[in-house]
């Protein structure tokens, strides 16, 4: 037996023994009928459920699962068989972690890690994953010989928007090294025990069930989906024992390559298990192994800029400056201009900068753009991006839109030199990068003088908002000559396609008809393609020949017919990025609507997840 397979089998046998003993002890203490479950999930023990279809609901269900686990450990001198033993380790880790939640326990209450990741969190990751705001998932475990190495790697992942899970001593090393952590910052500590790695694994597995329509019990389908659709990888730091190696084999079986920082010599498996001893190359090689390409944005600002900072919360005690509509005039407005009316890259500040000595200021953000292909309909599309772009700056928190805005700047960001001119630079560079197909010139004006801000809000911004609202209210499905497809989610749900109309947003809620129109203008070969309204077959249900034809093409034949307005006749497809489910309750001949946050049973006998 090779050194590598010997380590894998040694680890899987150790975990199998621990698992069997833990299950027997739990049954002896609580009885076989004792209920067991992970919190806030509809997928039971997700690894077991996805791989076998077994719904673990009580302790008495676990001995059979242990039997399946042990059957995967064959001790054969074959790498494929050894990888199956790695999957057995994953099953064992899931059972061991699940037992921690027995009797309503909260095993991570006193831990730095969060433990099990609830279903709503995974569903909330759907949109950023498919849009590329989260380009990949890193699982970092162990304890680095030099804490600075893992801190540097994790900060690099964070700056690139990679969702990073931490397991083991690296959690404390990153905390001490100043890494900002939390679900909202995309660096998530899971737990110190090596078995906590299963909480990262089940995120990938539930993604297959939620977004990919993989059926429970379809192990080949699950492995195919995670390998092809979930851009995850593993980094280990420090010495590794046979349990870590076996857990790594389970990751490789799911299609996730493993990069270690010790020399494995001839035990390396190119493309799957590799040694990278120079930590400055760890990130680069990890991304290469999953073919993750990241478009870096070098902006002339003194703080980091990444999607990972979008969820950063700035408390009042940590705040240097606030721009808030509750105290001062605020507005955000984009207007189309003739090219002769504006000066490209001109950034003007009317009033005091944030170093003027006050805590609270007015802030009206006025962006003027010009371009041969620019349309007034695109103004609001660009405007809504201000929220994301401001939040991408480390140390900046933005909420709201239009004339109801709150922006906070942290003491730390101010100390690093962040000023309003940098806000203008961010807006200019991001508009010219993301909207270069329609914008040729852009100038930015930031107004902090209270009188000037009030005048701008009342005389310029509000009338324009009202004009847009009046137009949107008059826009119906009948008033346009085309709809749009949206297949952004096909990276996770390959048979899904939305039909976006003026009266029907994309299922995720993030793509309006105007968004789809702008997306098509910006990228004519992209995810949003026009569907000209031709061949109306049924006005009542919204059935069109042209829509059916486009749906067939977009779903590669998986879906042949769609209606726009019927819940019973060929309703539109869905993936997992929705907030609510609407269904029919036959007894009362009525409809029910359930949101994903609701954890209870619905009148139709199913939970949201079911």
Language model regions located:
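Cysteine-centered metal-binding/redox modules
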Residues: 9, 13, 20, 24-32, ...
């Amino acid at each position: 037996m090779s050194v590598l397979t010997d380590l894998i089998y040694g680890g899987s046998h150790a975990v199998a023994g621990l698992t069997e003993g833990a299950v027997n002890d739990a049954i002896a203490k609580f009885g076989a009928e004792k209920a067991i479950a992970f919190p806030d999930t509809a997928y039971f023990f997700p690894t077991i459920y996805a791989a076998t279809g077994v719904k673990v609901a009580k302790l008495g269900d676990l001995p059979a699962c242990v039997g399946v686990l042990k059957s995967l450990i064959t001790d054969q001198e074959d790498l494929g068989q050894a990888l199956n033993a790695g999957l057995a380790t994953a099953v064992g880790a899931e059972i061991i972690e699940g037992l921690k939640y027995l009797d309503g326990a909260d095993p991570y209450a006193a831990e730095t890690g969060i433990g099990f990741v609830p279903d709503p969190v995974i569903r909330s990751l759907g949109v950023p994953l498919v849009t590329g705001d989260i380009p990949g998932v890193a699982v970092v475990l162990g304890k680095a010989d030099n804490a600075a190495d893992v801190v540097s790697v994790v900060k690099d992942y964070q700056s690139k928007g990679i969702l990073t899970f931490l397991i083991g001593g690296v959690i404390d090393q990153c905390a001490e090294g100043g890494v900002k952590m939390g679900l909202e910052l995309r660096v998530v500590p899971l737990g110190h025990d090596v078995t906590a790695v299963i909480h990262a694994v089940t995120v990938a597995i539930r993604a297959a069930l939620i977004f990919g329509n993989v059926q429970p019990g379809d192990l080949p389908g699950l492995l195919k989906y995670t390998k092809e659709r979930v851009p995850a990888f593993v980094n280990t730091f420090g010495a590794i024992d046979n349990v870590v190696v076996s857990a790594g084999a389970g990751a490789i079986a799911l299609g996730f390559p493993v990069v270690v920082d010790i020399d494995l010599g001839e035990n390396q498996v190119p493309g799957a298990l590799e040694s990278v001893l120079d930590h400055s190359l760890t990130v680069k090689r990890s991304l290469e192994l999953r073919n993750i390409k990241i478009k870096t944005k070098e902006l002339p600002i003194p703080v980091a800029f990444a999607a990972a900072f979008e969820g950063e919360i700035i408390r009042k005690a940590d705040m240097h400056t606030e721009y808030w509509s509750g105290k001062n005039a605020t507005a955000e407005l984009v207007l189309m201009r003739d090219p002769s009316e504006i000066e490209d890259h001109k950034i003007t500040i009317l009033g005091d900068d944030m170093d003027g000595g006050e805590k609270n200021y007015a802030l009206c953000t006025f962006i003027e753009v010009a371009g041969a292909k620019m349309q007034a309909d695109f103004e609001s599309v660009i405007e809504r991006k201000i929220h994301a772009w401001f939040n991408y700056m480390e140390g900046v928190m933005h909420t709201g839109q239009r004339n109801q805005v709150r922006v906070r700047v942290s003491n730390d960001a101010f100390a690093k030199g962040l000023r309003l001119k940098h806000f203008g630079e961010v807006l200019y560079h991001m508009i010219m990068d993301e909207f270069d197909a329609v914008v040729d010139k852009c100038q930015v004006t930031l107004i902090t003088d209270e009188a000037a801000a009030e005048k701008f809000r009342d005389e310029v911004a509000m009338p324009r908002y009202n004009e847009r609202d009046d137009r949107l209210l008059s826009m119906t499905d009948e008033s346009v000559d085309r709809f749009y497809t949206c297949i952004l989610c096909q990276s996770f749900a390959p048979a899904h396609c939305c039909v976006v109309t003026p009266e029907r947003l994309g299922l995720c809620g993030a793509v309006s008809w105007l968004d789809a129109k702008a997306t098509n203008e910006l990228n004519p070969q992209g995810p949003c393609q026009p569907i000209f309204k031709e061949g109306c077959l049924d006005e009542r249900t919204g059935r069109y020949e042209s829509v059916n034809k486009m749906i067939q093409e977009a779903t590669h034949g998986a879906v042949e017919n769609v209606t726009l307005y019927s819940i019973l006749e060929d309703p539109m497809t869905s993936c997992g990025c929705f907030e609510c489910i609407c269904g029919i309750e036959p007894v009362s001949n009525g409809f029910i609507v359930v949101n994903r946050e609701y954890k209870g049973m619905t009148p139709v006998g199913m939970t949201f997840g079911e």
